[in-house]
């Protein structure tokens, strides 16, 4: 038989448009499987239907339920309630993103910054993809260069953890910068020069202070902090030599 459910006090910091924050307190029963998202869904369905939050897959794939749990940017669906080691849990929205209501944030700016780094394969021959004989072949070593940075689920936790993103709304942010490096390091891509020229600014790669918080909170083990430092290295190579594919040339 399993252990009896434990009572946990759940405080939700809710953003109310034109009013600011208010706190709502609830008590939920939690067993060893209960996640923070489970608790919030229970509150929404059984206690307070006015609570607004965003979620979808419930299994750490979509990134929709990103929020701040006991001060740490986290996915609610991957945060076990009892593993927090306290009977008082506080959740709130990610404040580095524009706030909409309660725990829901606006990701328009986030995705605009993501799009700005051209997160797709750029090829000089635009008709190439329409030729059936065309293939983008890669060795396993070439895949290894970018694969660790390709697991991003666009949850926005890294941006919320970033001290620069919290004070400079113009900063590209760790998610976008890491994805820029992911595509620059892909041997199939030919858009490195354009990306480097876009990000050679204080609002781009040089704005990173290398605190590393972005990498600590990433639920998928992506290392945005490392990607940004490698991006800086590529920027220096490009500035000194004018070459844009030095890292690809050695593969």
Give the residues covered by each predicted segment.
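Short, structured protein-protein interaction patches enriched in aromatics and acidic/basic residues
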Residues: 57-66
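Eukaryote-biased recognition of intrinsically disordered, low-complexity regulatory segments
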Residues: 5-26
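Ferredoxin-type iron-sulfur electron-transfer modules in oxidoreductases and energy-metabolism complexes
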Residues: 34-49, 92-251
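Short, contiguous acidic and Ser/Thr-rich linear segments
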Residues: 24-35
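Glycine-rich phosphate/adenylate-binding loop and adjacent beta-alpha elements
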Residues: 69-91
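Charged, amphipathic alpha-helical segments
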Residues: 1, 45-55
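Extracellular/mature segments of secreted proteins
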Residues: 65, 85-86, 216
């Amino acid at each position: 038989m399993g252990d009896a459910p434990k009572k946990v006090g759940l405080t939700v910091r809710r953003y109310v448009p034109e009013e600011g924050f208010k706190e709502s307190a609830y008590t939920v029963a939690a067993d060893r499987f209960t996640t923070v998202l489970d608790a919030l869904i229970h509150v929404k369905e059984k206690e307070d239907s006015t609570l607004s939050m965003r979620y979808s897959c419930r299994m750490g794939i979509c990134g929709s339920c990103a929020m701040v749990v006991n001060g740490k940017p986290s996915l609610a669906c991957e945060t076990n309630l009892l593993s927090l080691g306290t009977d008082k849990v506080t959740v709130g929205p990610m404040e580095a993103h524009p706030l909409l209501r309660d725990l829901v944030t606006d990701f328009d700016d986030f995705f605009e910054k993501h799009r700005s780094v051209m997160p797709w394969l750029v090829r000089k021959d635009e008709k190439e993809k329409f030729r059936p004989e065309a293939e983008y072949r890669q060795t396993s070593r070439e895949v290894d260069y970018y694969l660790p940075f390709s697991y991003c689920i666009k949850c926005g936790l890294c941006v919320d953890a970033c001290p620069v993103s919290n004070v400079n709304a113009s900063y590209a942010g760790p998610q976008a910068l890491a994805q820029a490096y992911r595509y620059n390091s892909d041997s199939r891509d030919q858009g490195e020069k354009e990306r480097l020229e876009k990000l050679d600014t204080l609002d781009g790669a040089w704005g990173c202070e290398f605190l590393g918080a972005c990498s600590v909170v990433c639920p998928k083990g992506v290392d945005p902090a490392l990607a940004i430092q490698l991006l800086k290295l590529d920027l220096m190579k490009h500035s000194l030599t004018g070459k844009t594919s030095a890292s690809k040339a050695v593969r």
